[in-house]
């Protein structure tokens, strides 16, 4: 009985905070010839309650392939494309990515999810339970 209590408590620690906390996303806009929002990023901030379902990263490239605009923000809906599309008239392309874990719209986009923590934690839990 005690082992199941420990197991349920650990699961709650892993999953409960994500449902209580607001999603934290990098929120910034690039300016021409400036580094902010490209590689120098602000801290991830709580998304407003009305748009706290997904983090977005939107990149716009000109016809020469140079990055002309970059936005990182919160949104209520996931991206319908999650990739790049050509802009009309051969003016360049627009790339859109959405994700739903804290800070996932950062430069690398490599942020461990709660599932990754759980996969790491489960063998430890089962080992501890089997030793009792």
Curated annotation (Swiss-Prot):
One of its GO terms (molecular function) is toxin activity. Keywords: Disulfide bond, Secreted, Signal, Toxin. Contains 5 disulfide bonds. It comes from the Eukaryota. Residues 1-19 form the signal peptide. GO terms for cellular component: extracellular region. The scoloptoxin-05 family has remarkable similarities with the three-finger toxin family commonly found in snakes. Its main location: secreted. This is U-scoloptoxin(05)-Er3a. InterPro entries: Snake_toxin-like_sf. Belongs to the scoloptoxin-05 family. The keyword Disulfide bond applies. Disulfide bonds: none annotated. Expressed by the venom gland. It comes from Ethmostigmus rubripes (Giant centipede). It is found in: Secreted. The lineage of its organism: Eukaryota, Metazoa, Ecdysozoa, Arthropoda, Myriapoda.
């Amino acid at each position: 009985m005690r082992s199941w209590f420990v197991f349920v408590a650990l699961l709650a620690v892993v999953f409960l905070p994500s449902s209580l906390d607001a999603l934290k996303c990098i929120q910034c806009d690039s300016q021409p010839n400036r580094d902010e929002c490209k590689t120098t990023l602000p801290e991830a901030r709580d998304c407003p309650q009305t748009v706290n379902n997904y983090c977005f990263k939107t990149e716009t490239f000109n016809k020469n392939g140079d990055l002309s605009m970059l936005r990182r923000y919160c949104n209520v809906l996931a991206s319908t494309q999650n990739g790049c599309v050509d802009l009309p008239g051969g003016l360049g392309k627009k790339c859109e990515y959405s994700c739903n874990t804290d800070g996932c719209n950062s430069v690398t986009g490599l942020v461990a999810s709660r599932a990754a923590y759980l996969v790491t934690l489960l063998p430890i839990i089962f080992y501890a339970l089997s030793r009792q």
